[in-house]
Swiss-Prot record:
This is Large ribosomal subunit protein uL6. One of its GO terms (biological process) is cytoplasmic translation. InterPro entries: Ribosomal_uL6-like (IPR000702), Ribosomal_uL6-like_a/b-dom_sf (IPR036789), Ribosomal_uL6_a/b-dom (IPR020040), Ribosomal_uL6_bac-type (IPR019906), Ribosomal_uL6_CS (IPR002358). It comes from Staphylococcus carnosus (strain TM300). Part of the 50S ribosomal subunit. Keywords: Ribonucleoprotein, Ribosomal protein, RNA-binding, rRNA-binding. Coiled coil: none annotated. This protein binds to the 23S rRNA, and is important in its secondary structure. It is located near the subunit interface in the base of the L7/L12 stalk, and near the tRNA binding site of the peptidyltransferase center. Belongs to the universal ribosomal protein uL6 family. Signal peptide: none annotated. One of its GO terms (cellular component) is cytosolic large ribosomal subunit. GO terms for molecular function: rRNA binding; structural constituent of ribosome. NCBIfam families: L6_bact.
């Protein structure tokens, strides 16, 4: 069994954590994140550490405990270091470009596909075939990258499409003729 909830969260010196009831605000050099958590958890903030304490050992409290600790840790990492996901466009004529802050993808459709970044998300394009999604919220970065990938997911026969960097695409053989 995982013991994620019992780990103490180390808070860097340039990050401040503010706890008001079940609302936690984390401020750092890259920005600020606020989130409301379950009422049952309590928090111990001492020096540069934060500990999440559960009221009992019931199954629900144990699961909420681990999830809460992981989410707070992601908030602390996000405002101090940030998160990024890299996507690769593979296919003839597939390319990405920035128009202002918007991402425009040409991926084999009759029209270009445009993405407007949500608050706290930035796009960078390298070599026309690599897109980086950066931000302070791990959840938002992952969801945005997933939405971009969903425009043209990699297909198994030729491997064309948008994929995460390092993603393995299982290839299939085409049908054999007579």
């Amino acid at each position: 069994m995982s013991r994620v909830g019992k780990k103490i969260i180390e808070i860097p010196s340039d990050v401040t954590v503010d706890i008001k009831g079940n609302v936690i605000t984390v401020k750092g050099p890259k920005g600020e994140l606020t989130r409301t958590f379950d009422d049952s958890m309590s928090y111990k903030l001492e020096d540069n550490t934060l500990e999440v304490v559960r009221p009992s050992d019931s199954q629900k409290d144990r699961t909420v405990h681990g999830t809460t600790r992981a989410l707070i840790n992601n908030m602390v990492q996000g405002v101090s270091k940030g998160f990024e996901k890299t996507l690769e466009l593979i296919g003839v004529g597939y390319r990405a470009q920035l128009q202002g802050s918007n991402l425009v993808l040409n991926v084999g459709y009759s029209h270009p596909v445009e993405f407007k970044p949500e608050d706290g998300i930035t796009f960078t394009v390298e070599k026309n075939t690599t897109v980086k999604v950066e931000g302070i919220s791990k959840e938002l970065v992952g969801a945005t990258a997933s939405n971009i990938r969903a425009v043209r997911p990699p297909e198994p026969y030729k491997g064309k499409g948008i994929r995460y960097q390092g993603e393995y695409v299982r290839r299939k053989e085409g049908k054999t003729g007579k």
